[in-house]
């Protein structure tokens, strides 16, 4: 009997992990093919409608996920884990498949982007319900003392889903050629999701309900109002707040910094070509991914709290030197130019905006904003010098001074012409000063860059490997799905999701390419302090505690 139970647990872990990989595959396709999708569905939309669609696409990726956590978390605590995440994967899979057959703007007009955004919103809602269900289900099947190890496999699924989506896209692109892929071949990865959906539904139909939930339901102890019980009672709401600020907020920024901001830093700041950057990131993920399981297993031995909080602290203490070293090994010419050719922006401080632009639709057209935006895009460190009110901003590069221009009120065509001229003159000046247009491939120390990126990924595995077990153990069975899902998706959807745009705005405002790292550092330190004093250790808790 014990052997059969162990085999069932292992099969549950394996099958649930596979299904969650498929769901992440569906979610990542949109991001991986966003440029082609934009050309197919938004090319004929007027600016006002495009702004609305951009906001909604952004909401689907980040802001909508907590609402999915509420909807499906409640359902999971009312009717069961198995059937709830069966619903989430059907919504995700069907939404992805429909994108593959959806006519473009040229065929259906305005209806095409509207339907696309609705499908994307459904994807965000489904993803908001998937994680809590998968983590709860696996944890409630896991043997006591091994929940960290079992749930850590769920933590590998986002990385594996990204790998799978990139592999399918690369294979299709190579087979068809770039022109055919951009015209219609991009639909194939979306259409293939119907096969993955069929496999996932079959797997989940064969799974049994969580034994802990099943027993609780048989004894009539399920919650009649999970949302009210989870967040309307202070004793439970307090735990959810501690889980957010003392757990998932720090976990999210460390996760995004190690996997997404590192890629952004390589391609946008250090100007490493996209293919090389993707290979470097992929190698670091390949090396680091097994450590999700290692740290999950270790958390069963020494506790969830020391590993997660330790990951937040060591990340906060080492981000600046690590990213400085990445610059040194990935683009030494840029590092040298920053040291030898200092740049100063002279501007009226009242004209300098904090360029926070999460959906990419805001326009920054003061002379200061135009100057700083150019320098930030070109990875040029600069200092700030205050000028008299109303002064048009200028940029000093050594002995040269280039005057910016005020773009407010200019017609679109004139604004573009002035911007192009300013950018051209500034580009010539910074190239003469030694700032490279891109990283020289022959000067990139790929081995050292992969080592440094792997260190960042190891921080990710420290905070992310044990987090599912921690969240599951914080809440009683009757409200577990609901209560753990919301802090997880607020942390990852909002604290983590805003990281790239917040970091870029901080860089543009201060003139330091590393200044954006203060955002994840501050959040990680906040989580360390709150978690240290308020977060309980949970590894020895019994999940059969329903009260």
In which residue ranges do the predicted regions lie?
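Extracytoplasmic gate region of multi-pass secondary transporters
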Residues: 30-31, 236-284, 322-323, 350-385, ...
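Hydrophobic core of transmembrane alpha-helices in multi-pass small-molecule transporters
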Residues: 102, 108-128, 333-347, 443-462
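Glycine-rich segments within core transmembrane alpha-helices of 12-TM secondary carriers
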Residues: 126, 148-173, 196, 322, ...
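Extracellular/periplasmic helix-loop-helix junction of adjacent transmembrane segments
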Residues: 34-65
